[in-house]
């Protein structure tokens, strides 16, 4: 699977000046850029595109690098694939006796971007220009695209014992006896399509969610 960024006809590259960051943010920026480059998520860029960067707070108090892709998103042809309905999901859980919850490791980052579209993801910082080689948070079509891929992968089990909400997977058989078997089927599907769960964030054999 590859992520594609289709633009409106006649779109010209947009390049913004780097946003001003506080000294402590600059230090965190260098740290996160080094880490993401080491992991192969980003690379140096000479693209004519360039969006600004800022930081958002995570629930655990840490800061996450966030690319302000609004100029790119404005020119992107929108993917209309529907996102999961959380209320519908909870309705489906009625009668389930046991649950397991799988959290994909850096979910969006597990999907590569089509090579010719990588330059469109470029962002500018005081440390230089970079571009993503994998799907990034902030891209307007990332949620619907990821949802479509997950639904394609798990379609045989959806509405039976498995539901996916973006990068979270819930396994919920109606009886405990089938749970281990169903969990193995879901894990086998992840392995088949080379998606990986983050074990430390997964929870197994829960009695409520």
Regions found by a protein language model. Give the residues of each.
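Retroelement reverse transcriptase polymerase core
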Residues: 1-209
